[in-house]
């Protein structure tokens, strides 16, 4: 039966009555919340909001025609559903959790047997009574959507190949050598064709062979997996954003959930190696780190923490006789601790708490193993309350979910073990450790995994080719919102001895990645202790640079939460019409103002490695050469092992930490690097570092404005517990001529309050501790 549809406009409803009173109440609550957040944040644009989880669309956005249903989510995004059973999914699904968006303006009409839905960006045409199917031949005869792209009309229809898709990511880099994983990358949300499809149809396979499910009800407060209302239904989301890549990602996070901010400590240096360390050996590593003045924040206990090498839940007390004492000692030294898990084998009868768990599950006393069945809410409740909680009480800060063997569940057909483990572990921490930010370390589980940071990329091989492909892989993952990949810096496994230069280049690259973690397999010949290498001073400089850049990095993480644009992102986000932005795939933006072009080849006989670079249009500051250079060009340069090419956007202000050994302390002095070549601005974001308050406006921002020879530090906006009341600054004007004088707030400084380095051409201004609510103006005269 085809239902007649008259022309309508947004604000009218096709087939459901609007409950105006309820909607007005919703709007009042929303406006109050926005006003509250705006007051806290000072109206600076970084609006903190609780994560949206409202899957039922506004009825005004829905257009129904027979067995087809269309939901206009944004001017560029339309949901397409078709169900022969007349059953449409209104619950959250694995990728999409929120459809309650402001209704965009659109019109509908019937025309010559077609339903036409038009927004300001898209025109959808549906042949009334036509059947939409995923297995039909590619054709525009039943459904098509058209839009303008760079002055030409583009049409999509079911079955059309997206050959220009810019890709997303894949579950793991296990076995990566060079770019041998390229073919495994799943399609992303962005395409040079200007359109992409999110396919949440229940029969559609994800990259690991699993399918998407719905969320319905809860177990202990956690949204729980449920079967779709119609397994044969079509459930597509058409994204027609053209080359507005950042807008597409921002709107994706509106419907799929934001990228949560990880705890601050996670962005510091991790030590990790698959090796059976004893308590004394763990402590020796930490003491060596401190003796060598190496900044560090996280210690990983790989799988040998438990009695069975591969899997298990019980401490190996021959190696670690006092786990609580060891973890307390780590905490006392400023380190967080994570344990590795291979959970798929369940819980055997020789494990701690086995008898209690077996009894909780109502199993017979003859049962020797409680199987791993995380799709069972009863198992989740008992397993986590008995075993996971016991280890967390001992001080474990977060979990490394390393492998689930079976890609799909043995108990629920099509359920992806990776995605579901990530969902459960992350949300369990969110619900049960509310004084901390939830965090897990895991492999990619498919679209929607960005809600569960952070990513563990797996066991790659130690080769230059492997290193060379990882910049592309990491940046491209932002095309599905997965912004926190962590790699085994140095590679996981290797064929021969340690290569100090290759390790250095990996660490230099690692500075400009989301997670800064060294790791390797349990071959004793592989060394990951940087202080054991002949080039340790250079390796140490990479760690110091990482910690220096932390204010910039953490601010970029907040921006990712607000905008959906990840810390590492491809160049084509900012230069979508430049062919070089797509071709130079091992270059990427690290936040808004740093372009990174890592060295990924060995040095030649002259002790230098050549690299061909592209700089986009504009002016850039070449950090290696300490000079402003013009963009819109390709050039080749050579780099010693001491050098790694990265470029500041001209006019930027790059906020640095002073030298520090741990992120537990909040520095009372910051270094502001003022980049020549233009004007610009930056924002310094700060919060408590490991609470969920950042989602409710508990944070501060400080705006920094660079105009000509002047830097203005605007009064801080917002508040959070423990924030500094005053702060000193070291302001460095890079690569500039010596001024005649320097003033702060109109008062000329004496020579001791500022200096000039003739060799680096840097003006350094020392601003004493000043209340953070006071404006500071530093000017070169």
Question: What are the residue ranges of the model-derived segments?
Answer:
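A low-complexity, Ser/Thr/Gly/Pro-enriched, surface-exposed linker/loop concept
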Residues: 73-112
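Short, well-ordered beta-strand segments enriched in hydrophobic/aromatic residues
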Residues: 70, 78-80, 117-124, 595-598, ...
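Aromatic- and carboxylate-enriched substrate-binding clefts and catalytic-loop regions
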Residues: 156, 295-539, 574-578, 584, ...
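Bacterial N-terminal signal peptides
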Residues: 33-41
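Sec-dependent signal peptide cleavage junction
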Residues: 42-50
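Catalytic and substrate-binding clefts that recognize carbohydrates or anionic sugar/phosphate headgroups
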Residues: 109-263, 273, 279, 286-291, ...
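Extracellular/luminal ectodomains and secreted, surface-exposed scaffolds of diverse proteins
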Residues: 105-108, 745-771
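Catalytic core of carbohydrate-active enzymes
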Residues: 426, 447-455, 470, 477-487, ...
């Amino acid at each position: 039966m085809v239902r007649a549809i008259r022309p309508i406009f947004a604000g009218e409803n096709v087939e459901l009555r609007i409950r105006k009173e309820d909607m007005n109440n919703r709007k009042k609550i929303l406006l109050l919340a926005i006003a509250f957040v705006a007051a806290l944040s000072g109206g600076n644009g970084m609006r903190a909001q609780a994560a949206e989880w409202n899957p039922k669309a506004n009825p005004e956005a829905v257009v129904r025609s027979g067995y087809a249903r269309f939901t206009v989510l944004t001017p560029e995004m339309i949901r397409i559903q078709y169900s022969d059973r007349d059953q449409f999914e209104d619950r959250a699904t694995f990728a999409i959790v929120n459809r309650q968006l402001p209704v965009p303006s659109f019109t509908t009409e019937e025309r010559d047997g077609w339903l036409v839905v038009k927004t300001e960006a898209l025109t959808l045409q549906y042949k009334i009574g036509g059947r939409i199917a995923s297995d039909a031949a590619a054709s525009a005869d039943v459904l098509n959507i058209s839009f303008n792209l760079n002055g030409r009309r583009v049409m999509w229809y079911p079955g059309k190949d997206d050959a220009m898709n810019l890709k997303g990511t894949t579950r793991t880099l296990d076995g990566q050598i060079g770019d041998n994983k390229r073919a495994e990358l799943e399609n992303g949300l962005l395409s040079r064709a200007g359109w992409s499809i999110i396919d949440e149809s229940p029969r559609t396979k994800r990259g690991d062979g699993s399918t998407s499910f719905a969320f319905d009800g809860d177990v202990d407060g956690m949204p729980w997996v449920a079967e779709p209302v119609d397994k044969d239904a079509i459930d597509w989301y058409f994204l027609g954003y053209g080359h507005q890549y950042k807008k597409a990602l921002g709107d994706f996070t509106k419907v799929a959930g934001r990228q949560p901010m990880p705890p601050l400590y996670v962005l510091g240096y991790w030590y990790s190696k698959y090796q059976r360390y004893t308590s004394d050996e763990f402590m020796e590593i930490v003491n060596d780190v401190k003796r060598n003045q190496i900044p560090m924040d996280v210690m990983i206990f790989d799988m040998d923490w438990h009695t069975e090498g591969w899997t298990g839940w019980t401490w190996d007390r021959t190696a670690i006789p006092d786990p609580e004492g060891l973890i307390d000692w780590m905490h006392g030294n400023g380190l967080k601790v994570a344990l590795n898990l291979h959970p798929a084998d369940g819980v055997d009868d020789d494990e701690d708490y086995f008898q209690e768990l077996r009894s909780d599950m109502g199993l017979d006393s003859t049962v020797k193993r409680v199987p791993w069945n995380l799709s069972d809410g009863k198992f989740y409740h008992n397993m986590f309350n008995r075993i996971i909680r016991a280890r967390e009480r001992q001080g474990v800060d977060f979990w490394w979910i390393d492998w689930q063997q079976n890609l799909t569940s043995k108990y629920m057909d099509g359920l992806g073990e990776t995605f579901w483990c990530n969902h459960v572990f992350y949300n369990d921490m969110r619900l049960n450790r509310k004084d901390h930010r939830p965090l897990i370390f895991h492999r990619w589980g498919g679209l929607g995994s960005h809600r569960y940071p952070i990513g563990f990329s797996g066991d790659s091989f130690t080769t230059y080719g492997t290193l060379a492909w990882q910049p592309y892989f990491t940046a491209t993952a932002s095309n599905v919102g997965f912004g926190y990949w962590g790699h085994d810096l140095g590679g996981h496994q290797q064929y021969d001895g340690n290569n100090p230069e290759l390790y250095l280049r990996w660490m230099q690259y690692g500075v400009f990645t989301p997670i800064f973690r060294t790791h390797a397999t349990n071959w004793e010949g592989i060394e990951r202790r940087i202080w054991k290498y002949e080039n340790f001073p250079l390796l140490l400089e990479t760690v110091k640079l990482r910690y220096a850049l932390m204010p910039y990095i953490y601010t970029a993480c907040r921006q990712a939460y607000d905008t959906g644009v990840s810390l590492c992102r491809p160049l084509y986000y900012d230069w979508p019409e430049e062919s070089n932005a797509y071709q130079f795939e091992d270059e990427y933006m690290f936040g808004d103002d740093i372009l990174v072009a890592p060295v990924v080849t060995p040095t030649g006989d002259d002790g230098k490695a050549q690299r061909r670079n592209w700089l986009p249009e504009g002016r850039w500051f070449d950090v290696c050469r300490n000079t402003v250079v013009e963009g819109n060009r390709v050039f080749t340069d050579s780099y010693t092992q001491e050098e790694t090419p990265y470029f500041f956007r001209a006019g930027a202000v790059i906020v640095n930490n002073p030298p520090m050994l741990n992120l537990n302390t909040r520095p009372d002095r910051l270094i502001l690097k003022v980049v020549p070549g233009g004007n610009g601005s930056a924002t310094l974001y700060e919060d408590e570092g490991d609470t969920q308050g950042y989602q409710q406006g508990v944070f501060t921002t400080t705006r920094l404005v660079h105009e000509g020879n002047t830097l203005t530090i605007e009064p801080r906006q917002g508040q959070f517990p423990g924030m500094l009341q005053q702060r000193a600054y070291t302001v460095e004007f890079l690569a500039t001529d010596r001024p005649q004088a320097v003033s702060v707030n109109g008062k000329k400084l004496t020579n001791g309050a500022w200096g000039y380095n003739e060799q680096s051409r840097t003006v350094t201004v020392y601003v004493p501790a000043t209340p953070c609510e006071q404006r500071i103006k530093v000017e070169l005269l």
